[in-house]
Amino acid sequence: MGTEGPPPPAASRGRQGCLLVPARTKTTIALLYDEESENAYDIRLKLTKEVLTIQKQDVVCVGGSHQGRNRRTVTLRRQPVGGLGLSIKGGSEHNVPVVISKIFEDQAADQTGMLFVGDAVLQVNGIHVENATHEEVVHLLRNAGDEVTITVEYLREAPAFLKLPLGSPGPSSDHSSGASSPLFDSGLHLNGNSSTTAPSSPSSPIAKDPRYEKRWLDTLSVPLSMARISRYKAGTEKLRWNAFEVLALDGVSSGILRFYTAQDGTDWLRAVSANIRELTLQNMKMANKCCSPSDQVVHMGWVNEKLQGADSSQTFRPKFLALKGPSFYVFSTPPVSTFDWVRAERTYHLCEVLFKVHKFWLTEDCWLQANLYLGLQDFDFEDQRPYCFSIVAGHGKSHVFNVELGSELAMWEKSFQRATFMEVQRTGSRTYMCSWQGEMLCFTVDFALGFTCFESKTKNVLWRFKFSQLKGSSDDGKTRVKLLFQNLDTKQIETKELEFQDLRAVLHCIHSFIAAKVASVDPGFMDSQSLARKYMYSS
């Protein structure tokens, strides 16, 4: 149930474990939860670099002429000491078959080599008992005489409430006296109403042919390339406690994976996320081989977008985001070929997009607190989901996105900064049409020169200021902005008022260029301003 491979590197500051480190291989026992029946079934998870495999236990014939057959008919000879040598649980009153819950070592059931904990009892001496109550099956087995022939089949999805052991059963207390209960072991290792107490021959067959074994068998493999994780119940804002679901690119779902401890759940959420992230990086490298140096993919991955004006029962839906070259893309499904990049739902110019950490908070839920938190002390419960960020584009268009881990939020913040700064340095400048008092002008934001305003027809420069001369600004929230510059000679503040068709895009562009300029002078400045990363590494 551990993980193999090197330990994660220490974080640069503060506590360790903030970075997602891919797991080579990882296995554990978990539960597969069925939301319709509200039952959970024991499974084994196996994580490799590229695939998450769900395994279920089954009984298989590994020798003889019945190889592969699960259904078995076995004759038990009741012994003077130990009886049938097994206990049962379940019954139709709980909508589950009666199953063998214990097999006692060296007693009748164990000697056959054909019966296993988890076997569902289908027939007793030819009588079908699939729909029988617990008490009815107990009565049949106790009063069946010295020889009892039972037909069984391994129940691959035994509800967890039956509490069947996964390993070799050990001795247990005897519940055979008094009234039997479908959720407790009814001991059949004592004598029933047999006609004799003389020693009997061992139960058959004692030969090793056929030979049966209980094994973990692969039942589902979920490819992790471009897969996504969901911790929320479908169609709601209800967080699944200590559970999550993995959905492959083709829609195949792992089902709801529930873990026995919060620490296990956290470890597996981080491990699966890390492997998905590693495969995404490989896909980015492949895509970048086909792209020019100015059109490289900087970051991409799954998020959940908050729907505008949506019904409160379902306010988020999955989206795939990408930062590539000069653009920010919003997809409904990931781009897997060069041609897919033209089918984005939305495309925005990076220089005209404002990114900010929108909402992230903690709860008392240890599932969130176990290695997932950012360390914030100011909690805000306005939104139902933590780890949200906002994207505000031109004309006031905005999106709110949510990610599953705090480390993912920090990665998106860092990647937006990097992609924007790269684009600012590549383009060097951006020019916008504007007007003032009826005159058409051009306004240029230049990485090297700062701000320039000139006449659109004559190209005559009206004024020019450096970034450092901008001391403040104000706008009407619609089209007009006032820029306050300090004259280097007079030290006086000069106000320049302009009107733009898309004021929001211009303001975001100014912000992008100034931030990139500051970062070029002081590379550590943006890290100090990063809200998510600041709390990721704080103690």
Curated annotation (Swiss-Prot):
Tissue specificity of this protein: Widely expressed. Strong expression in brain and testis. In CNS, it is expressed in the perikaryon and proximal portion of the neuronal processes. Strong expression in the hippocampus, neuron-rich dendate granule cells, and pyramidal cell layers. Highly expressed in neurons of the cerebral cortex. Also expressed in the cerebellar cortex, deep cerebellar nuclei, thalamus, and basal ganglia.
Domain PH: 296-421
Molecular functions (GO terms): actin binding; neuroligin family protein binding; PDZ domain binding; structural molecule activity
Functional description taken from the UniProt entry: Adapter protein that binds to and probably organizes the subcellular localization of a variety of proteins. May link various receptors to the actin cytoskeleton and the dystrophin glycoprotein complex.
UniProt cross-references to Gene3D superfamilies, sorted A to Z: 2.30.42.10
Main localization, broad class: membrane
Membrane-protein topology: Peripheral membrane protein
UniProt feature, compositional bias: Low complexity: 168-183, 194-205
Family: Belongs to the syntrophin family.
Disordered, as annotated region: 168-209
Domain writeup: The association with dystrophin or related proteins probably leaves the PDZ domain available to recruit proteins to the membrane.
Cited InterPro entries: PDZ (IPR001478), PDZ_sf (IPR036034), Syntrophin (IPR015482), Syntrophin_4th (IPR055108)
PDZ domain boundaries: 73-156
One Gene Ontology term from the biological process aspect of the record: central nervous system development
This protein's name: Gamma-2-syntrophin
Keyword hit for Cytoplasm: yes
PANTHER family xref list: GAMMA-2-SYNTROPHIN (PTHR10554:SF3), SYNTROPHIN (PTHR10554)
